[in-house]
Curated annotation (Swiss-Prot):
It comes from the Bacteria. InterPro entries: ClpS, ClpS_core, Ribosomal_bL12_C/ClpS-like. The lineage of its organism: Bacteria, Pseudomonadati, Pseudomonadota, Alphaproteobacteria, Hyphomicrobiales. This is ATP-dependent Clp protease adapter protein ClpS 1. Pfam families: ClpS. Involved in the modulation of the specificity of the ClpAP-mediated ATP-dependent protein degradation. Binds to the N-terminal domain of the chaperone ClpA. The gene is clpS1. Belongs to the ClpS family. One of its GO terms (biological process) is proteolysis.
Length: 101
């Protein structure tokens, strides 16, 4: 007699999820000079002069504008660095992040 117990082979699939993306948003204020905002957008977000100007004007007209979309850590780092650059010069420049839907 054969008393061997046979177990079915089970496979586990590891599902790899992509990281959630977050938007970096420029909030308009009435004190930070346009040229400074454009300079920060070019430096921190590697935008061209034209791209930075369009984002800055959109934020000025609408009150806020999505600057870029990154993974959460990158978005928060860039938003913090850009906001800190404004604060270092005494401007109330503000970048925030929120999850992309």
């Amino acid at each position: 007699m054969n008393d061997a117990v046979t177990k079915p082979k089970t496979r586990t699939k590891t599902k790899v999820e992509r990281p959630k993306l977050h938007k970096v948003i420029l909030i308009n204020d009435d004190y930070t000079p346009r040229e400074f905002v454009t300079m920060i957008l070019k430096a921190e977000f590697r935008m061209t002069e034209d791209q930075a100007y369009k984002v800055m004007i959109t934020a000025h007209k609408l009150g806020a504008c999505v600057v870029a979309v990154f993974t959460r850590d990158v978005a928060e780092t860039k938003a913090t660095r850009a906001t800190d650059a404004g604060r270092a010069k005494g401007y109330p420049l503000l970048f925030t992040t929120e999850p992309e839907e």
